A protein has these predicted regions:
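N-terminal active-site wall of soluble small-molecule enzyme domains
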Residues: 1, 22-25, 105-168
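Structural preference for beta-strand elements that scaffold enzyme active sites
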Residues: 3-6, 34-36, 56-58, 80-82, ...
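Glycine-rich phosphate-binding active-site loops on the catalytic face of alpha/beta enzymes
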Residues: 7-15, 41, 53-73, 100-113, ...
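N-terminal hydrophobic targeting segments
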Residues: 73-131
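Catalytic cores of alpha/beta
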Residues: 1, 22, 37-59, 64, ...
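C-terminal helical cap(s) of enzyme catalytic domains, especially alpha/beta-barrels
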Residues: 19, 24-28, 51, 63-81, ...
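Glycine/small-residue-rich hydrophobic helix-like segments
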Residues: 2-40
Length: 171
């Protein structure tokens, strides 16, 4: 008569994890019960795939292993969405508040969404993972901007050569 039923995806003898365990067993549980899928959930895709079978998820080790619990939880719930073209602190905060994981900063002067690296420093107060968008910029500019702003990723939108990309990767 339990109202909440947990389905452990971990085999306690071998410690292997099989997320299909939830799919196989959930169909045997009465529909008026709350089903919790336990163990092995580590991505938004896992949550999406198991949502038709479970009402909730027990996630522990994936979150505990994260350096940033808030971002790890955000990624698990919303996935890794990027809102690009952020130019103001208010816009960056709104993107974060709405579930964004990445914030895109466009360092292409010809773009109407351009932000100068100096102005972008203010946006770093928002706990997003920031991505710098560059187009045919010098390697030195890209590297200096990435370092100054602690960018999590670099996105190239120009005609950068394979050699340019390889040199960028080496840094």
């Amino acid at each position: 008569d339990a109202q909440v039923i947990g389905i452990n995806n971990r085999d306690l003898h071998t410690l292997t994890v099989d997320l299909d365990t939830t799919k196989k067993l959930a169909v045997k549980i009465p529909e008026d019960r709350i089903v919790i899928s336990e163990s092995g959930i580590s991505s938004h895709d896992d949550v999406e795939n198991l949502s038709p079978y479970a009402d909730g998820f027990l996630v522990g080790s994936h979150l505990v292993a994260s350096d940033n619990l808030a971002l790890a939880l955000r990624e698990l719930i919303f996935g890794t969405h990027k809102v690009c073209g952020l130019k103001t602190l208010e816009a960056a905060q709104a993107a974060y508040d709405c579930g964004a994981y990445y914030g895109g900063l466009i360092f292409v002067e010809a773009s109407p969404r351009y932000i100068a690296p100096e102005a972008a420093k203010e946006l770093m107060a928002v706990p997003l993972n920031f991505v710098g968008v560059f187009q045919n910029a010098s390697l030195e500019f890209v590297l200096a901007t990435a370092e100054d702003l602690s960018l999590k990723a670099i996105q190239l939108h120009g005609e950068e050569s394979h050699d340019y990309i390889e040199r960028l990767r080496e840094k």
